[in-house]
């Protein structure tokens, strides 16, 4: 079976007339075939106490995602988005249009110095993975007043 990613012929607004003239078509085609490169969007913010990573993983269950820290302080978010299969086993379904990707994904982030990699925590809620990497407490310099003689 061949899946065509173009629009409905009866709807002229959904047809991409410039598809053949697209200079980035090869790159887009590669991105469609390699979801690991394109489909995991991650935000990284720094708070006074932690680095917080938020990843959109729609359709991924908690048991399909993995969070690891490699030696050298590299945070790895990986997993696999399962392909929707024929659930009743009759195989009488026919796909007309497929845009949602499936397959393995992985994102890697080098953590900065001072990240407490032994205290990383992760949670998932409604397809959003949140990874919190606490920061080492910065010691405020203690000032000692020196009397000036003379």
Curated annotation (Swiss-Prot):
Annotated gene: HSP16.6
Official protein name in the record: 16.6 kDa heat shock protein
Lineage: Eukaryota, Viridiplantae, Streptophyta, Embryophyta, Tracheophyta
Family note: Belongs to the small heat shock protein (HSP20) family.
Organism (species): Oryza sativa subsp. japonica (Rice)
Domain annotation sHSP: ranges: 31-150
Broad class of where this protein is predominantly found: cytoplasm
CDD domains in alphabetical order: ACD_ScHsp26_like (cd06472)
InterPro entries for the chain: A-crystallin/Hsp20_dom, HSP20-like_chaperone, Small_HSP
Induction description: By heat shock.
Domain of life: Eukaryota
């Amino acid at each position: 079976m061949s899946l065509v990613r173009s629009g409905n012929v009866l709807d002229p607004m959904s047809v991409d007339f410039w598809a053949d003239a697209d200079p980035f078509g090869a790159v887009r085609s590669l991105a469609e075939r390699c979801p690991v490169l394109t489909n995991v969007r991650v935000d990284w913010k720094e708070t006074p106490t932690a680095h917080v990573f938020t990843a959109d993983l729609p359709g991924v269950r908690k048991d399909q995602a993995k969070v690891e820290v490699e030696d050298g302080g590299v945070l790895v978010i990986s997993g696999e988005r399962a392909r929707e299969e024929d659930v009743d086993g009759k195989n009488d379904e026919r796909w007309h249009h497929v845009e949602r990707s499936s397959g393995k994904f992985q994102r890697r982030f080098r953590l900065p110095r001072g990240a407490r990699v032994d205290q990383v925590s992760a949670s998932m809620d409604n397809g959003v993975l949140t990874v919190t990497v606490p920061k080492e407490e910065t010691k405020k310099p203690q000032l000692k007043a020196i009397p000036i003689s003379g």
